[in-house]
A protein has these predicted regions:
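Trp/Phe/Arg-rich N-terminal binding region typifying the photolyase-homology
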Residues: 1-167
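Catalytic cores of enzymes that engage adenine nucleotides and/or redox cofactors via long glycine-rich
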Residues: 164-242
C-alpha cells in the first residue's frame, strides 16, 4: 500500500518554485493537499485590528482559486478547511489515515508552536519541513548560522561576495500523485472575493509573475534605495512580501 501524505499549504500557494510539490511529483504516494482558514484571522485582536481585512482576504481567495484550478489540471484536489489549524489537521490526519505530513519550514513563533503541538498530538506521523519561503536556503549561506550578521547590510555584502546561484524548482509536466479524496472540501468559487476587477493587487501565481516581469523590466530596482522608505506610491516598494 502506498504512503499517504498530507501537504499542509500556508504561504506557498503556487505550483512553480515549490520544492515540496516538485519532490512529491516524482514519488509514489497518495496525496492530500490542504489549506486551513483560521477564523481568528478575521477577528479583532488586542488592538481592535483584524489580521485579515477585506483586501487581504480577497488576495487570499484569489490565490486559492488560481491554485485550485492549477492543481485540477495536474490531477489533484485542493481541500480548503476552516477552524483552528492544529485541531483541524489532527482530525484530518486521523480521518485520512495519514502516514506523513509535509509543509514549509517557518521561523515564526506561532507557526512553530502549531507544528510542535501537531507533532505531540500525532506521534505516529512523520513530519517533514522544507525551506521554500526564503530567497536562500540555509545550505546556500557562505557562513554558519552562529556567524549570521546582526543587520542586513553586512549580510548582503557577504552574500553578494559569494555569488550564490539561485535555482527554482519546476513541477514536472505530469500528473501529481493521486488524491486521497477526489471531491474538494469547500471548493473556491468565482464570487466577489475572487473578482479581479476592483483589486489594486491580485492574488495568485500569474499575477505575481506579471508583477516581477514589470518590476525588473524597468528602472524601478535602480531607485529602490531612494524610495524604499516612502509611505505612499504604488511603485515605491517591491511588494515581494505580498
Amino acid at each position: 500500500m502506498s504512503k499517504r501524505i498530507l501537504y499542509w499549504l500556508q504561504n506557498d500557494l503556487r505550483i512553480d518554485d515549490n520544492p515540496i510539490l516538485s519532490e512529491l511529483a516524482t514519488g509514489q504516494c497518495a496525496l492530500d493537499i490542504v489549506f486551513v482558514i483560521n477564523p481568528d484571522w478575521f477577528k479583532n485582536n488586542n488592538y481592535q485590528q483584524k489580521p485579515y481585512g477585506v483586501h487581504k482576504q480577497q488576495f487570499l481567495m484569489q490565490s486559492l482559486f488560481e491554485l485550485q484550478q492549477a492543481l485540477i489540471e495536474h490531477g489533484q484536489t485542493l481541500h480548503v478547511l476552516e477552524g483552528e489549524p492544529v485541531s483541524v489537521l489532527k482530525q484530518r490526519i486521523a480521518e485520512q489515515h495519514i502516514d506523513e505530513m509535509v509543509c514549509s519550514e517557518h521561523v515564526g513563533t506561532y507557526e512553530q508552536r502549531q507544528l510542535a503541538r501537531l507533532k505531540a498530538h500525532c506521534p505516529h506521523v512523520i513530519f517533514k519541513t522544507t525551506q521554500q519561503d526564503t530567497l536562500f536556503q540555509q545550505s546556500d549561506l557562505p557562513f554558519d548560522l552562529n556567524e549570521l550578521p546582526k543587520s542586513f547590510t553586512p549580510f548582503r555584502k557577504k552574500v553578494e561576495a559569494a555569488s550564490i546561484p539561485i535555482t527554482t524548482s519546476t513541477l514536472p509536466k505530469r500528473l501529481l500523485p493521486q488524491p486521497i479524496t477526489l471531491c474538494a472540501a469547500n471548493p473556491i468559487e468565482l464570487n466577489e472575493h475572487t473578482n479581479y476587477n476592483n483589486a489594486v493587487m491580485h492574488g495568485g501565481l500569474k499575477s505575481a509573475q506579471t508583477h516581477l516581469k514589470q518590476y525588473f523590466s524597468g528602472l524601478l530596482p535602480s531607485t529602490y534605495k531612494i524610495t524604499r522608505n516612502e509611505l505612499d506610491g504604488f511603485n515605491n516598494t517591491t511588494k515581494f512580501s505580498s
